[in-house]
């Protein structure tokens, strides 16, 4: 009897490489060290590696490389293969991965990450609030945008290295994240697509948050989403000072004052190390 599944065809050459599986509050990453040798990561390869059934599985693939401007560079690929500018949770993992405090070159600019017990503090830089920096398709107020989707309140928009829209809901229990998330992410108002944040103030300087991430969908946590939401909340005078942001995966503390940089504090976890043949993806 013939085996019903054809064998995997042999390859002429293999490109073996090591990786680490890491996460920040359950937002998980495959982290590849490309400082000693280039690793060819295409959108198709990133998508295959991120596949939880046929690949290694992750929300984002992180490529750590050399930099002329910083200690290391970081490239970020979502699970759909798209390359993005920033990822707060991944940034907290970098000092744990390299074993020291680091200045990181990203597509969003230079980010400084300092290791603390169990995690890191990251200077995420200053938020951008102008409509064309989000970017939006046309000019409008980004603090209270004159747009709406179904019963959601008027949102705010913030760019923290990547674009975010933030809805402050009175009660999130009735919000259909799986339907509204992709609907808003791909709305023509957002020419670069957008990360969609559903937030609820649940106490003094305490926000509950669920994020539909651009290119990844619902995740356990989104560091840049927590930063964008805290910035929007400060601008609307809903919070003041360091703010606890509770996501499905746990808590982050975000500190921002108007005109300043955003400081994000939270955990980072190393899960395991592995080795893979990248030509098979």
Positions of predicted regions on the chain:
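Short glycine-rich anion-binding loops that position phosphate/pyrophosphate groups of nucleotides
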Residues: 25, 127, 163
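Internal active-site segments that recognize and position negatively charged phosphoryl groups
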Residues: 143-174
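Generic low-complexity segments that are intrinsically disordered, proline-rich and/or Lys/Arg-biased
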Residues: 5-11, 128, 136, 156
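Active-site-proximal beta-strand elements of phosphoester/diester hydrolases
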Residues: 123, 155-159, 208-210
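Hydrophobic alpha-helical segments and helix pairs
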Residues: 100-139, 143
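A glycine-rich beta-to-alpha transition motif near the start of alpha/beta enzyme domains, typified by
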Residues: 3-118, 166-281
């Amino acid at each position: 009897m013939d085996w019903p599944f054809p064998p995997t065809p042999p390859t002429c050459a293999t490109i073996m490489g090591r990786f680490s599986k890491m996460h920040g509050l359950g937002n998980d990453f495959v982290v590849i060290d490309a400082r000693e040798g280039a690793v060819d990561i295409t959108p198709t390869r990133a998508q295959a590696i991120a596949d939880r059934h046929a690949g290694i599985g992750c929300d984002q693939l992180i490529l750590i490389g050399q930099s002329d401007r910083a200690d290391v560079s970081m490239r970020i690929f979502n699970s759909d293969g798209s390359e993005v500018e920033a990822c707060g949770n991944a940034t907290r993992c970098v000092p744990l991965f390299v074993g020291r405090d680091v200045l990181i070159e990203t597509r969003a600019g230079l980010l400084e990450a300092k290791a603390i017990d169990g995690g890191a503090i990251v200077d995420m830089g200053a938020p951008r609030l102008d409509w064309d920096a989000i970017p939006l398709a046309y000019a409008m107020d980004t603090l209270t945008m004159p747009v709406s989707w179904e019963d959601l309140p008027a949102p705010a928009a913030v760019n923290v290295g990547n674009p975010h829209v933030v809805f402050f809901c009175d009660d999130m229990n009735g919000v259909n994240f799986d339907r509204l998330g992709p609907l808003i992410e791909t709305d023509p108002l957002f020419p670069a697509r957008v990360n969609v944040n559903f937030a609820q103030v649940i106490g003094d300087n305490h926000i509950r948050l669920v994020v539909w991430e651009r290119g990844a969908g619902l995740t356990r946590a989104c560091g840049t989403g927590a930063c964008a939401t805290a910035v929007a909340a400060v601008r609307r005078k809903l919070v003041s000072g360091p703010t606890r942001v509770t996501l499905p995966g746990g808590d982050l503390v975000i500190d921002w004052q108007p005109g300043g940089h955003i400081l994000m504090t939270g955990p980072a976890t190393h899960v395991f190390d592995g080795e893979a043949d990248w030509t098979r993806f």
